């Protein structure tokens, strides 16, 4: 969030955003940060989200995260995969920045495929 409103904030057009938070972040912090991101001018270009698994100390539950996502009408038609092992958790997957990917998010059939990096 520190780059929002600056010349260093990236263009979000045609992007899949990878979001994660640290152990001190609580559900209200994530909710506020997500809403702030939604208000960015290029947010309409976002094509999907991959949300990292929250650390246990954050007390974020699957139900809380689902409620936060459901409360954002701007997310209703976007594919979203949550509880992915990257960021501040272990095990940790490393994803390339940039490149091309395909994201499909269905209840029991989700896929993130890195096509080019």
What is the predicted role of each segment?
Residues 5-8, 38-40, 91:
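Short, flexible, glycine/charge-rich loop motifs used to bind or transfer phosphoryl groups or to couple energy/partner
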Residues 16-24, 50-59:
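Glycine-rich phosphate/diphosphate-binding loops and the adjacent beta-loop-alpha structural elements
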Residues 28-42, 65:
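A short, acidic, amphipathic alpha-helical segment used as a generic capping/interface helix at domain edges
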Residues 40-45, 74:
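Short, conserved loop/helix-junction motifs that constitute active-site signature segments
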């Amino acid at each position: 969030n520190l780059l929002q409103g600056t010349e260093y904030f990236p263009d979000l057009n045609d992007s899949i955003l990878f979001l994660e938070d640290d152990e001190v972040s609580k559900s209200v912090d994530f909710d506020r940060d997500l809403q702030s991101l939604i208000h960015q001018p290029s947010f309409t270009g976002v094509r999907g989200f991959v949300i990292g698994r929250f650390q246990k100390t954050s007390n974020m539950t699957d139900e809380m995260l689902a409620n936060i996502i459901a409360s954002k009408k701007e997310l209703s038609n976007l594919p979203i995969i949550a509880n992915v092992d990257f960021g501040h958790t272990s095990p940790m997957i490393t994803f390339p920045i940039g490149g091309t990917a395909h994201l499909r998010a269905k209840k029991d059939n989700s896929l993130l495929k890195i096509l080019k990096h």
